């Protein structure tokens, strides 16, 4: 679910109006992170590291309201929950875009991810499905 933000009363209206004129109205950062402990936890849980870090990342995103805002057309919307999308490599060295519905239980999420990986690996093309709105 999502809700449209009333820009006329939103305290970030001025920021939105400024940044929405940019060709890419967002910023990204990268930083090295020591993932040793996360890797060890994933292995102890017998969950692939990819699933572990993706789950923890999306769980963190969903805890921060500002990370759940999206620009849709001329509107800002706030999603109740953000799901995951990742590129999945195939044997022939091509990849496809995936959609992985977030689940708070990491074992349930692991099942969702594995099902999606298997689907992508036998589905040709870059865009392998319709993405929910």
Q: Which ranges hold each PLM region?
A:
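Helical lid/core segments from catalytic subdomains that handle acyl or acyl-like groups
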Residues: 90-133
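Short amphipathic alpha-helices and their capping loops
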Residues: 1-21, 80-89
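Alpha-helix initiation and N-capping motif
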Residues: 12, 35, 106-110
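Short alpha-helical functional segments enriched in proximate histidine and acidic residues
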Residues: 60-67
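Small-residue-rich loop/turn and linker elements
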Residues: 67-99, 128
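Structural preference for long, well-ordered alpha-helical segments in enzyme cores
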Residues: 54-60
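Gly/Ser/Thr-rich phosphate-binding loops and adjoining beta-strand/alpha-helix segments
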Residues: 5, 20-49, 70-82
């Amino acid at each position: 679910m999502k809700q449209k933000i009333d820009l006329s009363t939103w305290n970030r209206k001025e920021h939105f109006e400024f940044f929405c004129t940019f060709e890419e109205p967002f910023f990204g950062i990268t930083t090295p992170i020591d993932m040793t402990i996360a890797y060890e936890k994933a292995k102890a849980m017998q969950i692939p590291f990819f699933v572990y870090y993706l789950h923890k990342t999306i769980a963190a995103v969903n805890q921060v309201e500002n990370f759940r805002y999206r620009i849709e057309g001329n509107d800002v919307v706030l999603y109740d929950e953000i799901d995951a999308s990742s590129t999945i490599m195939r044997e022939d060295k091509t990849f496809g875009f995936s959609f992985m519905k977030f689940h708070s239980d990491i074992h349930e999420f692991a099942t969702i991810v594995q099902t999606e990986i298997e689907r992508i690996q036998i589905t040709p093309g870059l865009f392998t499905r319709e993405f929910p709105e």
